[in-house]
């Protein structure tokens, strides 16, 4: 690797890297659907409740009818698949895509669909202070 700037890690610009780090309990809640992962550089990365996710969607600068469908789904967990030839999986995917457009991620969608063309890795670590943390990484070329 050629060093271009000192004290800066340079990577191939066509590669993608992302990482979610949280406590084991945060990940358990995310996997169970009790919280959502919120990834916005302005507000910081964090896990948020369903109510906070609804609030983020309601206050979106780019709110559309699809955003309203996502809000309705989060509020009621009722799914209207009529726009998707009654295919509930396709309807859910569209809702989760709209949530992702607003930086709100449901666990299964984030892990299995959002970065579907990237390599994934998940690991658990114990900190020196005794806390258990989990790390979820996606990396590779997405092009």
Predicted segments, located by residue:
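Low-complexity intrinsically disordered segments
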Residues: 46-140
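Intrinsically disordered, low-complexity regions
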Residues: 13, 23, 34, 45, ...
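Short, extreme N-terminal segment that most often corresponds to the first beta-strand
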Residues: 1-26, 137-142
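Charged, amphipathic alpha-helical linkers/stalks
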Residues: 29-49
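Intrinsically disordered, low-complexity peptide-like regions
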Residues: 10, 15, 37, 78-81
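Intrinsically disordered, low-complexity, compositionally biased regions/tails
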Residues: 17, 26, 37, 48, ...
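Intrinsically disordered, low-complexity segments enriched in small/polar residues
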Residues: 20, 31, 42, 127-128, ...
